Every structure is written in C-alpha cells, then in structure tokens.
C-alpha cells in the first residue's frame, strides 16, 4: 500500500445489528416418524409412479437409494458417504435423491442419513441452525438417538456413535 492510500476503518459501530444478532432457536414443527406412505414395489408400479415433489417419474438410481435407505433400522443412522460407497456413486447424488424422496418418513426414512462427520446436515437442503435440521433432530430423538448442541451424533439406540452399514 502506498503512503497516499489509507486503510478504510470499519463503519460498523457496536450498536450495529450485525454485532448484536441473537441466535434464533428453531423448534421442531415436524417430528412425524410414523406415517407410512405408499411405496411402489413392482416394476410396473415403479415405472409409472410420478413423484409429487417433481411431477416426474422417479429414476432407477433414486429407487436404488430408497431401497437401501429402507434397510436402516429405527434408532440407527448411516451417512451419505456410506450409502454412496454401497451404490458406487457420489454422496451428493445420494443427497439429491433423498431431497426428492416422496416416501418419507416411512417407508424411506431419509432422516436416518447424516453427514460423514456425524452431524445433521443436508436435510431438505438445510444446514446449521435452521428449521429443517431442528425437524430432523426431533425425528431422530424420537427414535432414541442423541446429539450434542452442535447437532453431532453422541449416541444411537445402542448407546454408541456407530454408523449403520450392514446392507
């Protein structure tokens, strides 16, 4: 920087709303883990089913993701990465399929899928402190899982923080 240039001082004062923001606490408004929706089981049903979220047919890859997620037992979680490894795919592709899941909460419990670092994230595109994460945490708590204040898995129904991967 030359001598003729000066550094700009911050114009924000301590009274600026950016300095005094209060953290919003989200309360779950959807903790349903019991509703069972129709799931196509035959080839013909799968071929003709229209996803109400997209108004398009569900892809073969999405059905592969959903079939695998359906195997995750209540009180357990797996990761997007573990699913993608099993499917020989990518975690983002798995997340995209779950974001469009029209069969939740059951028979396809996408709320049982968490990030590789064992934190809740990606649920309906939500990360961090948001309504979607609060809802997912409430669903998992109803199934016996515990998370810390940063939404990281502390224990599953077995009392440990293991990830389900027994496909």
Where are these regions (language model features)?
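Short Lys/Arg-rich cationic patches that frequently serve as NLS/NoLS or arginine-rich RNA/DNA-binding motifs
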Residues: 2-21
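Nucleic acid-binding interface residues in structured DNA/RNA-binding domains
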Residues: 17-167
């Amino acid at each position: 920087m030359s001598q003729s240039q000066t550094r700009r001082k911050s114009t924000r004062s301590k009274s600026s709303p950016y300095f005094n923001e209060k953290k919003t606490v989200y309360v779950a408004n959807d903790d349903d883990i019991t509703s069972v929706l129709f799931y196509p089981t035959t080839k013909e049903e799968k071929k003709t089913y229209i996803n109400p979220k997209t108004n398009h047919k569900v892809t073969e890859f999405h059905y592969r993701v959903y079939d695998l997620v359906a195997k995750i037992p209540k009180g357990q979680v797996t990761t997007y990465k573990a699913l993608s490894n099993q499917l020989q795919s990518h975690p983002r592709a798995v997340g995209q399929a779950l974001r469009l899941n029209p069969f939740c909460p059951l028979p396809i419990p996408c709320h049982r899928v968490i990030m590789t670092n064992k934190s809740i994230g990606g649920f309906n595109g939500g990360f961090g402190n948001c309504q979607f994460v609060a809802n997912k945490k409430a669903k998992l708590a109803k199934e016996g899982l515990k998370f810390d204040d940063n939404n990281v898995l502390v224990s599953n129904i077995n009392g440990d923080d293991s990830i389900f991967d027994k496909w």
